[in-house]
Amino acid sequence: MCPGNWLWASMTFMARFSRGSSRSPVRTRGSLEEMPSVHHPFLNVFELERLLYTGKTACNHADEVWPGLYLGDQDMANNRRELRRLGITHVLNASHNRWRGTPEAYEGLGIRYLGVEAHDSPAFDMSIHFQTAADFIHRALSQPGGKILVHCAVGVSRSATLVLAYLMLYHHFTLVEAIKKVKDHRGITPNRGFLRQLLALDRRLRQGLEA
């Protein structure tokens, strides 16, 4: 379980015991390989939730989900000693606001900072930040020795959504492939609104490849 994530615990409980049927879209049985591919004609938010609640659900304050790319929480972002130990050169904060996250917080560490003022709400349009965030991550990982922490409050929804978008935009992963890749290392739960936006990105990218 992600540190301090009471919401994760309650949602996992509901996923396991609600509806009382093996047809529940968020059941926890089965392996990732049994999940539908992105080309499945009925792939939707509910199928993605099945995938998200299958397999690895644990996470630490930060987990390396791609070489040099750490997905984590606010506690890790505030831990200067650990950031220095990991060799973090860039921080992308997906929960930036006037009280949480400033470039000045990393003075003396040589860390470059990007803040995204996003709300963990299904109604929030995270897609407007997909390209900017992906570009920032790409620049961080392109420099010699570059390592980036992408975080929000808990590190499972807002920041995870931006990491998934990065893998899709820069590494041509399908959404399902991106989710599987991240879940090999960290449990994530983007909210339904973010999943819909990622599905829209996935369809747009696939249409571009097929054109």
Curated annotation (Swiss-Prot):
Catalyzed chemical reaction(s)? O-phospho-L-tyrosyl-[protein] + H2O = L-tyrosyl-[protein] + phosphate; O-phospho-L-seryl-[protein] + H2O = L-seryl-[protein] + phosphate; O-phospho-L-threonyl-[protein] + H2O = L-threonyl-[protein] + phosphate
The residues annotated as the active site are C152 (phosphocysteine intermediate)
Give yes or no: UniProt keyword Cell inner membrane: no
InterPro entries, alphabetically? Atypical_DUSP_subfamA, Dual-sp_phosphatase_cat-dom, Prot-tyrosine_phosphatase-like, Tyr_Pase_AS, Tyr_Pase_dom, TYR_PHOSPHATASE_DUAL_dom
Asked whether the UniProt record includes Cytoplasm among its keywords, one would answer yes
Which terms does the record give in the GO molecular function aspect? Answer: p53 binding; protein serine/threonine phosphatase activity; protein tyrosine phosphatase activity; protein tyrosine/serine/threonine phosphatase activity; RNA polymerase II-specific DNA-binding transcription factor binding
Show where the Tyrosine-protein phosphatase domain sits. 60-207
Where in the body, by tissue, does this protein show up? Brain and skeletal muscle. In the brain it is expressed ubiquitously except in the hippocampus.
Compartments annotated for it: namely:
Cytoplasm; Nucleus; Golgi apparatus
SUPFAM superfamilies in the record: (Phosphotyrosine protein) phosphatases II
Q: So which domain of life are we looking at?
A: Eukaryota
The record ties this protein, via SMART domains, to: DSPc
EC main group: hydrolase
Q: Which Pfam families would you find in this protein's record?
A: DSPc (PF00782)
Keywords of this protein's UniProt record, alphabetized? Cytoplasm, Golgi apparatus, Hydrolase, Nucleus, Protein phosphatase
**Can you supply a Gene Ontology BP term from the record?**
positive regulation of cell adhesion
Cellular component terms per the entry's GO annotation: cytoplasm; Golgi apparatus; mitochondrion; nucleoplasm; nucleus
Its biological purpose: Inactivates MAPK1 and MAPK3 which leads to dephosphorylation of heat shock factor protein 4 and a reduction in its DNA-binding activity.
Which family is this protein grouped under? Belongs to the protein-tyrosine phosphatase family. Non-receptor class dual specificity subfamily.
Complex formation: Interacts with HSF4.
Could you tell me which PANTHER family the record lists for this protein? AGAP008228-PA, DUAL SPECIFICITY PROTEIN PHOSPHATASE 26
Q: What is this protein called?
A: Dual specificity protein phosphatase 26
* Source organism: Mus musculus
